[in-house]
Structure formats: C-alpha cells, structure tokens
C-alpha cells in the first residue's frame, strides 16, 4: 500500500473531497482501500504501476464525480504517464489553465470523440499528426457516455479543436460498470488505442496490462457484480 501519487487526477480528487459537505459514497464505500490504487488494501497493486514514456500527452476533462469514483480509469493514465493533465469539466466557468493549454504552441490538441458528433466546421482526423514538431495533446472526456455527449456538445471552447475519431473494432473489456454498448471503450482503453495509433506500442501494451491488472484486483475483492 502506498500514498496516492501526486498527479492531476488525484489533485482533483483531493480538491473535491475538501469542498464536499458530505462523503461521496460510491459502491463498495465500506471497503478499506489503498489510497494509491483504490483497490482494497489487501489486494494493492501499487508495486505493479509502470512508469511510461510516450511521445503524446493526455488531457482529461472529467465529470465532477469521476475523480471520486474508485472505478475511474482516467486515474490509471495519470498513474503511468507523467505528462497527463486533468480538469473538472465546466460549460461556462472554464479553467484558464485549460484555455492556456489549448493555445500552447508546443502542443497539437485533438478531442478524442466519434467523428459523427463533430461540428460542421470542425476538422475530423483519423490519424495523429505531430505537425511542425508539436506534441500531440489528446483530450479525452472522462464521463459516462451520456455525460460525455453532453460535455462535447456544450463545450464551445473545443469547437475549433480537431476531432480524433478512432477507427477500432475493439470491444471494451471494462467490467467494473455496466454499459449498454460493448464498443464503448472506457477512458483508459481510449488512451491505449491512441497510443497504438501514435506508434507507441510498448506504452499502449503496458498501460493496457496495468488496466487489466487493476480490473482483476478490483473484481477479486467484490462480493457481487457491479450494478
């Protein structure tokens, strides 16, 4: 068991807990969890967390409740990849640090989302192009599918950002929450697919392996399937 790593997602979690007037009671709230990996203490996987290097960066726009959920997989990205940013999504009160990041000329931002939802004037890409030496910044909406569609639609500050539409036949292996669609990938699966697309195969496979290890450890401590 270890203290939680100091990264953007865990800082959002700490801030949300500090602001809350009552505890956030997720499923399994009675379980004594490792603060580092959010798995039950006796099944801690912190020692198995890989430190990865990649040619791309990630930016998670998170629904307000996501950092508080022990089943959140966006945290796994930040656990492994140090150049990961995270912000709580807001439609009107946008974090100025996020806006500065979107305009940072060191990065080429993309919103990772199905192309059919793009605005008519919005560029849709199926490949990652680090043009003019700019580092790809992949923005992932970390929420349920219903929430993510709303977030995408109601984020005018993303309207000029190219959409990266993943073309994958991969089915989700996420087993900690129920979904009506097997082709809806969870956040960390999207990140792994992006790493593959960028040619970072080793990082993609290591991140996917850590995700599978997290899922197996989490489920091994559950008394029943998630509802």
Regions found by a protein language model. Give the residues of each.
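Short metal-coordination and nucleic-acid-contact micro-motifs, chiefly zinc-binding Cys/His arrays
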Residues: 30, 40, 54
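Short Cys/His-rich Zn2+-coordinating modules
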Residues: 11-27
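Short cysteine-rich clusters marking metal-coordination/redox-active sites
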Residues: 34-37
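Short Cys/His-rich local motifs and their 1-3 flanking residues in nucleic-acid-associated proteins
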Residues: 39-42, 46
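S-adenosyl-L-methionine/SAH cofactor-binding core of RNA-modifying enzymes
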Residues: 82-149, 153
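Short, acidic/turn-prone active-site loops that include or flank metal/cofactor-
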Residues: 65-66, 91, 166-171
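C-terminal folded domains that constitute the principal catalytic or ligand-binding module
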Residues: 137, 145-227
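Short microdomains enriched in Cys/His and/or Lys/Arg
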Residues: 47-75
């Amino acid at each position: 068991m270890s203290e939680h790593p100091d990264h953007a997602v865990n800082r959002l979690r700490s801030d949300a807990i500090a602001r809350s007037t009552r505890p956030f009671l997720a499923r399994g709230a009675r379980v004594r969890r490792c603060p580092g990996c959010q798995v039950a203490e006796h099944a801690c996987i912190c020692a198995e967390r890989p430190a990865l290097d990649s040619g791309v960066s990630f930016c998670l726009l998170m629904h307000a409740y996501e950092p508080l959920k022990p089943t959140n997989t966006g945290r796994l990205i930040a656990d492994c990849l140090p150049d990961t940013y995270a912000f709580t999504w807001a439609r009107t009160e946008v974090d100025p640090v996020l806006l500065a990041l979107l305009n940072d000329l060191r990065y080429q931002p993309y919103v990772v989302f199905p192309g059919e939802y793009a605005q008519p004037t919005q560029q849709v890409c199926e490949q990652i192009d680090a043009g003019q030496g700019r580092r790809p910044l992949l923005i992932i909406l970390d929420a349920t599918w219903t929430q993510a569609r709303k977030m995408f639609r109601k984020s005018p500050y993303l309207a000029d950002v190219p959409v990266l539409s993943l073309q994958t036949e991969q089915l989700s292996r996420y087993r900690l929450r129920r979904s009506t669609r097997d082709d809806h990938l969870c956040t960390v699966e999207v990140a792994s697919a992006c790493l593959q697309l960028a040619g970072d195969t080793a990082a993609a496979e290591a991140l996917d392996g850590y995700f599978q290890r997290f899922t197996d450890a989490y489920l091994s401590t559950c008394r029943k399937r998630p509802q």
